[in-house]
Swiss-Prot record:
Function: Catalyzes the four-electron reduction of biliverdin IX-alpha (2-electron reduction at both the A and D rings); the reaction proceeds via an isolatable 2-electron intermediate, 181,182-dihydrobiliverdin.
Top-level EC class as recorded in UniProt: oxidoreductase
Protein family membership: Belongs to the HY2 family.
HAMAP family with a match to the protein in the record: Ferredoxin_bilin_red
Keyword terms: Oxidoreductase
Single Gene Ontology BP annotation: phytochromobilin biosynthetic process
Cross-referenced NCBIfam families: PRK02816.1
Protein name: Phycocyanobilin:ferredoxin oxidoreductase
Amino acid sequence: MLDTSPVSIRSQLNPLICQLAEVILSHWQEYLSLSLYKLPDGLGYVEGKLEGERLVIENRCYQAPQFRKMHLELAKVGKGLDILHCVMFPNPDYSLPMFGCDIVANSRAVSAAIADLSPANAELTLSPTYQKALSQLPSLDFRESRDLPEWGDIFSEYCLFIRPTNAEEETQFINRVADFLKIHCQLAVQSQPVSVEQETLNLAGQKYYCTKQQQNDKTRRVLEKAFGQEWADKYITQVLFDLPY
């Protein structure tokens, strides 16, 4: 049974982050056979200082037959920055995309919200099964779309990257993340292990995704300021975007 009780900082975070964390955990529990994933020692809960402000990072990690690692990170910097970060890393013996979701906010507003099912193959395309399921979702209209980073070729055409401007748009974003999760979990459970040759290709695709994500300078700068370069490198490469095998 997955423990979905609030972590100690969740109630202190922006309401959208609180709601989304619950949506993610509840979908994992409903659809997947979960077990705990062991993080490197000392990296499950971390406290530090960033420009005089208290920084707290809390991580939850699980695994399932189809996913080698399912990571949910919640972070808070003083009273001015709340963060949710989530990635579902497939087991390479299943040909599945990468689910990812991030929110950057403060107590009053959300500055960025992104969610995607990103292809993890050499062609950088989703499978026909995923294409069909995602294409049937209703289109959404948001006032403020955000530009993807320069390294953003890993994202799919269904990627949602916005700044929600009101409660209605926040609800639309949560509902779309729930759509992504339901599709992803259901198709993952229905999927079958692949050949050794395809597993090698899946590994390469996942490594490409992780290598691109490690180029996120904003994340690195925050971690280096709070904990130093060596610790930041370790956290990024062993917790946020560890390379399989």
